[in-house]
Amino acid sequence: MTRVLSVASECVPLVKTGGLADVAGALPAALAGQGVGMRVLLPGYPAVLGAAAKTPVLREIPDLFGGPARIRRGALGKAVLYILDAPHLFDRPGGIYLGPDGRDWPDNPQRFAALCKAAALIAAEGVEDWRPQVLHLHDWQAGLTPIYLRQAGVRDVRTLLTIHNIAFQGLAPAHMLSALQLPAHLFNPSGFEYWGRISALKAGIVFADKVSTVSPTYAEELMTPEFGMGMEGVLADRAGDFTGILNGIDLDAWKPPYATPQGKAPHRAALRKEFGLPETDGPLCVVVSRLTGQKGLDLLIEALPALLENGGQLAVLGSGDPGLEAAFAKAAARHAGVALRLGYDEALSRRMIAGGDAILVPSRFEPCGLTQLYGLRFGTLPLVALTGGLADTVINASVAGLAAGVATGVQFHPVDARTLSRALTRLCALWHQPAAWQRMMDNAMAHPVGWDASARAYAELFEAMAA
């Protein structure tokens, strides 16, 4: 059995701000049946320690970036959880990355360097008579680990860095080299220096044995200037060691309340009632998203007439950019077929995916995306931009896709308002072709969106790395 330590800054069900947490939480169970024994290392935030009360201390660390720390043992479902209990770094009010003022904690570089140091310590010395063969590092927060492994003289433990979102690069000023206990001779363009600053993400990309991201298309995109956000050259240099493995979803946690597409009707009616939308002979489209430009929702505002003029409706759940919040509120006030709920409500999001006919994901870039996978699972047809994981998970209702009977949704490209308008018009036209729509719903609900294929891909990669 390959021994793997997953090093992450967040993990469901303990703490979550984004999709990274879903992957970190799902992989241990998904890999258990693939011959991989994965354990997880997390920072000791209050929520994590609270869920693992009175856990045994496995290791004392006298000084870890300004204070004492301990490695504790907990549980993550059936998987072993290691907790880095460092109160001076993690026991504080606010979010896990942001303070109560909404700004990054100024000591974030030290906080997550500590996580990397703890991972390197476990790799070097083991814990509980267990020592990993592979460290699975998630995003910049775990990116310095390969450097600390080098410093510890560890040569027999391999590292995989998974990039969940290239936009977060773990930048710190150069004067922090000493504070972060980093070797000055690696602070150069071939190392972890990035435009005069330290980049923890670049450190991981350059020094990890392998690099992955969360979909094959996003892997290709990241090696281009349009999507690479300055890291495209570094990733292109690692192209032979860089791969894309799709995320999955927990099929038990996301189980539709109906077995066939016909079961959607009462949920659609209930959702219309909940949002105050009138009954109409058109598709009920839903958006469950952060309201940001990255998600392409400014384009949806511009393209909205195409949906409404063709009899469609829109229900939106989310929050984010104040300008977009105001734009959707204005649209809801003007049009009976548009409704908005600001904020996030997990139970409501599930009711929306169950009751909606289509889920709109017009993102400008999307590493993998989860909402379109939920839509497929529930027979709520995804309308998506042709980018990242959206391109890899939805089969377009093109003439060929419909003729072959394999379509599961609607894709559009390029990602602009005019093309989105045409896609919305096409979606509404398909709605009025009941046989085609029914076939697409059947295809969507049968489409494999769980972790099985992804877990096999990770297991094969880990096994090859450990050999």
UniProtKB/Swiss-Prot annotation:
MF terms (GO), sorted A to Z: alpha-1,4-glucan glucosyltransferase (ADP-glucose donor) activity; alpha-1,4-glucan glucosyltransferase (UDP-glucose donor) activity
Chain positions recorded as ADP-alpha-D-glucose binding sites: 16
GO cellular component: cytosol
Keywords: Glycogen biosynthesis, Glycosyltransferase, Transferase
Record has Glycosyltransferase as a keyword: yes
Biological processes per GO annotation: glycogen biosynthetic process
Keyword Transport: no
Signal sequence residues: none
This protein's pathway: Glycan biosynthesis; glycogen biosynthesis
CDD domains found in the cross-reference section: GT5_Glycogen_synthase_DULL1-like
Domain of life: Bacteria
Catalytic activity from the UniProt record: [(1->4)-alpha-D-glucosyl](n) + ADP-alpha-D-glucose = [(1->4)-alpha-D-glucosyl](n+1) + ADP + H(+)
EC nos: 2.4.1.21
Primary enzyme class: transferase
One Pfam family per UniProt: Glyco_transf_5
NCBIfam families attached to this UniProt entry: glgA, PRK00654.1-2
Family note: Belongs to the glycosyltransferase 1 family. Bacterial/plant glycogen synthase subfamily.
Reported function: Synthesizes alpha-1,4-glucan chains using ADP-glucose.
HAMAP family: Glycogen_synth
PANTHER family named among the record's database cross-references: ALPHA AMYLASE DOMAIN-CONTAINING PROTEIN, GRANULE-BOUND STARCH SYNTHASE 1, CHLOROPLASTIC/AMYLOPLASTIC
Protein name: Glycogen synthase
